Curated annotation (Swiss-Prot):
Keywords (A to Z) from UniProt: Aminopeptidase, Cytoplasm, Hydrolase, Magnesium, Manganese, Metal-binding, Protease, Zinc
GO CC terms of this entry: cytoplasm
Pfam families hit by this protein: Peptidase_M17, Peptidase_M17_N
Protein name according to UniProt: Cytosol aminopeptidase
Quaternary organization: Homohexamer.
Provenance organism: Xenopus tropicalis
Binding site for Zn(2+) 3: 200-201, 301
Length: 520
């Protein structure tokens, strides 16, 4: 993948519902905090509007919460917070966070549910404030949507600090004042899935090699039950599958390639065609012989973001027990410039027999995906969805606002787009015109060229057109997630660093597909 951004950090925080992680005796003995929501006034003359949980707390303290909010300054704006001490005997510290307007909902211009996004952002602010005060047990107001509140808490507290001696205290979050435990737990699982992807992407490349990546999922899925199977395919298996494009990239590194295959059989109908996820898994991308600039190259430890998101998504689907069959495929290797590495102008053969002229060794992700997509067809899939940090051109086109989606199926696009509205992790449809296919199928030496004859124009589109040459399935989507790989401050409930996007959208997409009984 061509270079585009730099990044940073993470840490694992255990998040659950009250009573699930600690005994009641221990829970009562630790310092506790409470995060409550308040809505922004639609009109200045309106009275303060608290959430249901906020109202209950205010009643318990005889109106002191409303009184303190009124005395402390103007109405709280969206994403802003105030902290109050000594109001409630059970909670020495209470953080009140602004939820924006109560009338917020699906914003057709922004293509997300604004109310859910406001809750995620507000809760993350409150939980981080509690962490800064070293309050390790925090109860969270569901704010009208317990799933969104859980996502805000779990995503907002995540920070990669495994390599640091000094760490922030881990915070455990609990649902407060509501019976919406099922929705809360669902939100925790969605967010933990994204955090797993963030962790893998953020970890140094010498810690997350192709082998270590596969071992991570072997360990996490070992006790998930007989309907979850993990296959770690060796270099010999890859050779037997005649995945010449994938192997051509892997041969530049001393680290052996791995093809990770995860099967989740959630449907009661064993014959149900599976949804197949495919993720690019370049655990470090130096660019190969077409070497990247040294500045920012460390960020290329996250170039396996596609593999991290699809494998985390299937792991979460299994935890949620979604009634759907899913297979996740992840070709894993490094792209390095040793004496055996691909050279510009080399020709390699993919699994389907097509030859590829490799004019730029830094356009390596599409070579891995070409063979993996061919293999995906062997499962008679209901749909194929691949994710990859594929092109810097995608970052230039959309930035971090949305992942680009190239698809041959309007049915598939509708499901992906609807899922993204719910999660707030947006997608945007991009073109698969024949115009771009012509650019990759005109090659001097082979059937295909890996960068196209106009290498600087429409890079994300020509990369998608290249992948299309390895797809015969009627329902396929390619998600170019290069622009959303990392977060500076664009997503308020994610700290700076690798984002793990769009894991939650993939999970929500799978959940929605499991409910769609349409025969296709």
């Amino acid at each position: 993948m061509l270079p585009f951004r730099t990044l940073l950090k993470w840490s694992v925080n255990r998040n659950c519902c009250r009573g699930f992680a600690v005994s009641q005796q221990n829970y009562n003995s630790v310092k506790k905090g409470l995060v409550l929501g308040v809505y922004e006034k639609e009109k200045e003359e309106e009275s303060l509007t608290l959430t249901n949980a906020g109202d209950a707390v205010d009643n318990a303290v005889l109106g002191k919460l409303r009184d303190q909010l009124a005395r402390s300054g103007p109405s709280l704006k969206k994403g802003k917070s105030r902290i109050f001490y000594g109001l409630h005997e059970d909670f020495p510290s209470i953080v009140v966070v602004g939820l924006g307007k109560k009338s917020a909902g699906v914003n057709q211009h922004e293509l997300w549910n604004e109310a859910k996004e406001n809750i995620r952002a507000a809760v993350s602010v409150g939980c981080r404030q509690m962490q800064d005060m070293e309050i390790v047990q925090v109860e969270v107001d569901p704010c009208g949507d317990a799933q969104a509140a859980a996502e805000g808490a779990v995503l907002g507290l995540f920070e990669y600090n495994e390599m640091k001696k000094k760490k922030k205290k881990a915070v455990t979050t609990h649902l407060h004042g509501s019976s919406e435990i099922t929705a809360w737990e669902k939100g925790v699982l969605y967010a933990e899935g994204q955090n797993l992807a963030r962790h893998l992407m953020e970890a140094p490349a010498n810690y997350i090699t192709p082998t270590k990546f596969a071992e991570t999922f072997e360990q996490r899925l070992a006790n998930m039950g007989s309907n979850v199977k993990v296959f770690t395919r060796s270099k010999q298996w890859i050779e037997e599958q005649q995945m010449g494009a994938f192997l051509s990239v892997a041969k530049g590194s001393e680290e052996p390639p791995v093809f990770l295959e995860i099967h989740y059989s959630g449907s009661s109908d064993a014959s149900q065609p599976p949804l197949v996820f495919v993720g690019k898994g370049v655990t470090f991308d130096s660019g190969g012989i077409s070497l990247k600039p040294s500045s920012g190259m460390d960020a290329m430890r996250g170039d396996m973001g596609g593999a991290a998101t699809v494998c985390s998504a299937i792991t979460t689907a299994a935890k949620l027990k979604l009634p759907i069959n899913i297979i996740s495929l992840a070709p894993l290797c490094e792209n390095m410039p040793n004496g055996r590495a691909n050279k510009p102008g080399d020709v390699v053969k993919a699994k389907n027999g097509k030859t590829i002229q490799v004019d730029n060794t830094d356009a390596e992700g599409r070579l891995l995906l070409a063979d993996a997509l061919c293999y995906a067809h062997s499962f008679n899939p209901r749909a194929i969805v691949n994710a990859a940090t594929l092109t810097g051109a995608m970052d230039v086109a959309l930035g971090s606002a949305a992942a680009g989606v190239f698809t041959n199926s309007s049915w598939l696009w509708t499901h992906l787009q609807e899922a993204s509205v719910v999660t707030g992790d947006r997608v945007w449809r991009m073109p698969l015109f024949e115009h771009y296919s012509k650019q990759v199928t005109e090659s001097a030496l082979a059937d295909l060229n890996n960068i196209g004859k106009y290498s600087r124009s429409g890079g994300a589109c020509t990369a998608a057109a290249f992948l299309k040459e390895f797809v015969t399935a009627p329902h396929w989507a390619h998600l170019d997630i290069a622009g959303v790989m990392s977060n500076k401050d664009e997503v308020p409930y994610l700290r700076k660093g690798m984002s793990g996007r769009p894991t939650r959208t993939l999970i929500e997409f799978a959940a929605r597909l499991s409910e769609d009984k349409q025969t296709i």
